[in-house]
A protein has these predicted regions:
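Hydrophobic helical h-region of N-terminal Sec-dependent signal peptides
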Residues: 9-17
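C-terminal segment of classical bacterial N-terminal signal peptides
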Residues: 16-26
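A residue-level marker of the well-folded mature domains of exported/periplasmic proteins
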Residues: 5, 28-394
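Aromatic (phenylalanine/tyrosine) cluster motif
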Residues: 3-4, 16
Length: 394
């Protein structure tokens, strides 16, 4: 599906203004905010793009000036952070991603008077560093339950999850998805009287950038009968969706099932609005924006800030989220109002085809998570991922 990939690249260039070099934005001497991205980079349709979205919203709403610094390899993290700090030009320097943790710890010590922020890190404990973490396990439990129940409804007995590099933060996604699958199986049996026995296929691809590996992993899962594929690898989701699209085309279909489950951003608008059933929205944009806002209003405080379902940091995608991201595409000039209508109509039909009780059940689990009645395993917390795999098996 070369056309699909080229189309996605064109969308990203128009919306996000992809950069070829390491720096973009205002002239360095005039900037106040530096955003240092990980190797996944812009154009991933999820994690890094959401980080940039939050910074761009701060530009629009708070009047800050932004320099975006791309990391082309892991070797770039330390010098990128050091160069930004050494310039003395920035009120805050934000690292987007777990992979920057070691470099951020070193640079925070080297420049004690510089304010820093980092996403997906909560253990560094530096007096000049705001650490922003997310309850990905809770959001993944919601889409895990949805995946199991929807798969069973459509006659599938497997769901899949395609992950990136095997790191602790991704264990949180896996742990929650496993819990959700088991919860969804139990709820389906309770409502229908039939035990669906939906099982899990999972693959740590070892990359956040090789789209072909995402596609290959998804193809293998589809061949084994998976009805849902959860993307937990940023841009590899482009490959996941390519595989699903080609699988459907081979059957003379354009709409799922099988479906993809999106991650981080709202990815429901991809696949013409009828091949991504839902997205586990991890609001990296909210985290980046809140860090910048704290500097603007003078409330910056070092330490750990956790974002989850209770404070807007984690959510399963809803219709308004779809509308917001369609607006974003229209603003970038890559879709039109006519596209809005077809994407929204396809999405509405896709969602309506899933029985209402399944969506109600997802809402029930969400309420139980919020109240604390449902305790979702974490993965990198005291309960290890090995124990969780035993407790909530494939």
């Amino acid at each position: 599906m070369k056309y699909f990939r080229i189309k996605m690249a064109a969308i990203l260039i128009a919306i996000f203004g992809l950069v070829a070099g390491p720096l973009s934005g205002a002239a360095l001497a005039a900037t106040k905010v530096a955003l240092v991205l990980d190797v996944g980079g812009r154009g991933d349709l999820s994690f890094n793009d959401m980080g940039f979205k939050g910074a761009d919203e701060a530009v629009q709403k708070l009047g800050v000036e932004l320099v975006e610094i791309q990391s082309n390899s892991a070797a770039d993290y330390l010098p990128n952070l050091q160069n930004a700090a050494r310039s003395g030009a920035f009120d805050i320097i934000i690292g987007v991603g777990f992979l920057l943790a070691d470099s951020m710890a070193e640079v925070a010590d080297q420049f004690p008077d510089q304010k820093f922020g980092i996403i997906d890190v909560t253990w560094l404990g530096k007096p000049n560093l705001m650490e922003i973490g997310y309850e990905e396990n809770k959001g993944s439990a919601l889409v895990g339950a949805l995946s199991a129940m929807a798969a069973a409804h459509y006659g599938y007995d497997k769901i899949g999850v395609v992950l990136g590099i095997e790191i602790p933060v991704l264990y949180k996604f896996e742990a929650g998805y496993r819990y959700g699958m088991h919860w969804g199986n139990a709820k389906y049996a309770e409502v229908t009287g039939s035990n669906p026995g939906v099982g899990l296929l999972w693959n740590y691809t070892g990359t956040f950038s090789d789209i072909a590996k995402g596609k290959a992993a998804t193809e293998a899962m589809l061949a084994q009968g998976a009805g849902m594929i959860y993307n937990v690898a940023g841009p590899l989701g482009i490959g996941d969706l390519e595989a699903i699209t080609e699988h459907l085309e081979a059957k003379g279909k354009s709409a799922g099932p099988p479906f993809m489950i999106g991650v981080d951003a709202n990815q429901d608008y991809l696949g013409d609005g009828h091949r991504v059933l839902a997205s586990m929205m991890k609001r990296v944009d909210f985290g980046v924006y809140s860090a910048i806002e704290s500097v603007v209003n003078g409330s910056f405080k070092a330490g750990v800030k956790i974002l989850g379902p209770g404070n807007g940091g984690i959510a399963i995608s809803r219709r308004q989220d779809l509308a917001d991201f369609i607006d974003f595409g229209i603003k970038g000039g890559v879709i039109t109002e006519a596209d809005r209508g077809s994407i929204t109509a396809n999405w509405d039909a896709m969602r309506a085809a899933v029985p209402g009780w399944i969506w109600d059940a997802v809402g029930e689990l969400e309420a139980k998570i919020s109240s604390g009645e449902a305790e979702i395993p974490c993965g990198w917390c005291p309960d290890t991922i090995g124990d969780i795999r035993n407790q909530y098996p494939d």
